[in-house]
């Protein structure tokens, strides 16, 4: 039993270090853009509380440590997934934010890989449906979550030159439609998980009710440009993930 807890600890350490390293590189590449946005202007680099060289060293150190730690203490598959997370986030998603609005879809890929790191770290087959179910759960969850953020901060994103689907969507109509579409994808995914025997049917029923409840601000939205409904929908996405993961942990115990 103790060995399992140590394995969990090493997996968490390696995954966290890889994520922090990716975030450091992201902020290095976006110093000037972050300085233009109120929500990011107080980060260490744009606020000049940290030097570029120090951030570069921290980024490389954390990213390298995370991948190497996973390879040494967990397994090669976990290290490969961590390296893929860093590569996609830093070299594809980050620059893509400047030239194509589909960057949110691409950015959701590295954001959804960590559950796969945990899956293979625990000894699961990297091709197993259970691991990929968790990947798609995180993937589809991120989209409504970040659509709401990007709409609420759309003026800042436009000022910084980021190409987001919310750009120019003053009424919020397009963002609302996208929010609903990918929320339906979430519901469909969990129904598929139940239908294939990953967990009992009550999980799918409870999940569907939860998603519909949390979508209420968007479903009643009149595309009037009001911020309150979108903010409520965003807060709902924050509530959604821990509730669902706790429910899945209970169903799988």
Residue ranges, per PLM feature:
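Intramembrane alpha-helical segments
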Residues: 52-123
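Functional transmembrane core segments of multi-pass inner-membrane proteins
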Residues: 2-6, 108-150, 154-155, 159, ...
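Interfacial loop-to-transmembrane junctions
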Residues: 174, 215-243
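Transmembrane alpha-helical segments that form the membrane-embedded catalytic/substrate-channel core
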Residues: 16-24, 87-95, 136-154, 187, ...
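Short alpha-helical packing/oligomerization segments
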Residues: 188-213
């Amino acid at each position: 039993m103790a060995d399992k807890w140590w394995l969990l600890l090493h997996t968490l350490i390696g995954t966290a270090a890889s994520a922090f390293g990716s975030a450091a590189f992201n902020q290095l590449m976006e110093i000037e853009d972050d300085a233009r946005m109120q929500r990011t202007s107080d980060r260490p680099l744009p606020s000049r509380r940290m030097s570029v060289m120090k951030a570069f060293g921290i980024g490389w150190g954390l990213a390298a440590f995370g991948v190497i730690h996973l390879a040494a203490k967990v397994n090669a598959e976990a290290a490969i997934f961590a390296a893929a997370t860093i590569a996609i986030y830093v070299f594809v998603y980050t620059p893509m934010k400047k030239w194509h609005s589909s960057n949110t879809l691409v950015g959701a890929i590295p954001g959804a890989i960590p559950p796969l790191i945990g899956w293979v770290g625990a000894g699961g087959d990297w091709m197993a449906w259970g691991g990929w179910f968790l990947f798609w759960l995180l993937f589809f969850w991120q989209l409504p979550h970040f659509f709401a953020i990007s709409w609420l901060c759309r003026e800042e994103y436009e000022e910084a030159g980021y190409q987001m689907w919310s750009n120019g969507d003053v009424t919020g109509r397009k963002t609302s439609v996208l929010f609903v579409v990918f929320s339906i994808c979430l519901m469909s995914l969990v129904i598929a998980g139940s239908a294939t025997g990953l967990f009992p049917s009550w999980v799918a029923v409870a999940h569907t009710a939860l998603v519909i409840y949390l979508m209420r601000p968007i479903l009643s939205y009149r595309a009037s440009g009001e911020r309150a409904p979108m903010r409520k929908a965003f807060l709902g996405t924050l509530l959604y993930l821990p509730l669902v993961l706790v429910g899945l942990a209970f169903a799988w115990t």
